[in-house]
Amino acid sequence: MKIIFSPFFGNHVFIDLDKKGSLIGQKYAGSQELIGELRLRSGLTSVLPDSMERTAQYMKAIRSTFKENKGSHAEIFRSSFGKDELGVAMTLLGWRDALVGLGWNPSDYTKSQKLNALMDIEKHFDCAGVADCKRELLETLQAGQADLSGITIESVLPEGMLPCYFAALLSAAHKCGAKVVYSPAPSAAAAEG
């Protein structure tokens, strides 16, 4: 199978079939489609809950943190949480997901009270989101725990122009047997005159 990838492809990519011919054995994939395809082929299938379900689960985790640990770092959010549970849960979950997407390890305490608060809440939260799935996929491929032979991933962008996560993902996919082809880097052309 050949996956033609660009992080800038959306859900619907126009393909001129008169010029292209058949699409059998090919798939055009944006970011989420590539992640989904590689997760499926790595045996990491999962159904993600919607954002409101995750927010509700995070609210429960915050409540549990307050209830079970009176001296928790999360106490800094108690007053705000008492006034707007949903808003605070949405904000903190957004912070958490952004940090997970950047490789945050919630087991290492830091000098940051807010990070430590998120770590305390994390102990009561088990509801994976997109950032968790991306991290799990990258870790699985980097550990060589998938067989991706028979897959060709053709990046529309040169390797140096890919966002960091996707550059690492394609490199890890290559180590698992996928053939990865990058478009050539654009050459610099001097203006005439």
Predicted stretch roles:
Residues 1-14, 154-156, 181-182:
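Short, hydrophobic beta-strand segments that form beta-sheet elements in well-ordered domains
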Residues 8-149, 160, 164, 186-187:
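Basic/charged alpha-beta structural segments of nucleotide/phosphate-handling enzymes
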Residues 151-161, 173:
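Histidine-centered acyl-transfer/condensation active-site motif
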Residues 164-193:
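Conserved RecA-like helicase ATPase core segment
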